[in-house]
């Protein structure tokens, strides 16, 4: 083994214990501009950096959700930089962190591949104007109705067999992203 690392899918407290367990070369975390407080999140990314552990990012476009934003969230981004895709905004956000060494992006066609390549050829950090636009989009997304479910699963098992945390997650995601196809698939 030349480089030792791990993929992480739990709360930050667990992440910190794993990072402190040994001298890792890298870790893989879910990270994007909407998931800065999810799992390891921004706090974990910064802690890994303080320990010299490189970051591999998965879900930079949140399973494609950030590539297909509703108009209320995409309008500030489009106005700030016409011609850049919504996926490009998500990828550039993640690339803006020095400790991010690899960004994994799931692509399903050549157009997405070309868009990702053009995003990083060359990579251009956000301008102050673009940061303001992205903050406006994030604020708009986070302002949408949310039922407050944390996914703790204390409501399970449900006597009627309903997977309550999953149903609430789908409802929250639909309220925020208005993606009927994603909601129906889940």
Please tell me what each predicted stretch does.
Residues 1-5, 54:
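Short beta-strand/loop segments at the ligand-binding rim of alpha/beta enzyme cores
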Residues 2, 25-28, 101:
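Conserved acidic residues
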Residues 5-10, 28-35:
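Catalytic beta/alpha-barrel core
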Residues 9-10, 38-39, 85:
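Residue-level recognition of alpha-helix initiation/capping sites
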Residues 10-23, 41:
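Distinct, well-ordered alpha-helical segments
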Residues 14, 37, 113:
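Glycine/Thr-rich phosphate-binding loops of Rossmann-like dinucleotide-binding domains
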Residues 21-23, 42-186:
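Structured C-terminal cap/extension of enzyme domains
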Residues 33-37, 62-65:
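Short gly/pro/ser/thr-enriched loop/turn and capping motifs at secondary-structure boundaries
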């Amino acid at each position: 083994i030349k480089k030792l690392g791990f993929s992480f899918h739990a709360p930050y407290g667990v992440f910190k214990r794993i990072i402190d367990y040994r001298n890792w070369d890298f870790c893989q975390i879910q990270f994007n501009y909407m998931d800065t407080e999810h799992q390891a999140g921004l706090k974990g990314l910064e802690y890994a950096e303080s320990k010299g552990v490189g970051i591999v990012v998965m879900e930079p476009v949140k399973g494609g959700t950030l590539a297909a934003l509703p108009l209320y969230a995409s309008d500030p981004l489009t106005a700030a930089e016409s011609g850049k895709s919504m996926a490009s905004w998500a990828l550039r956000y993640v690339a803006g962190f020095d400790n991010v060494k690899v960004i994994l992006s799931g692509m399903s066609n050549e157009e997405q591949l070309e868009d990702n390549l053009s995003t990083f050829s060359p990579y251009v950090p956000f301008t102050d104007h673009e940061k303001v636009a992205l903050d406006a989009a994030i604020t708009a997304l986070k302002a949408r109705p949310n039922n407050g479910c944390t996914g703790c699963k204390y409501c399970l098992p449900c006597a009627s067999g309903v997977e309550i945390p999953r149903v609430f997650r789908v409802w929250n995601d639909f309220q925020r992203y208005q993606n009927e196809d994603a909601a129906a698939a889940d």
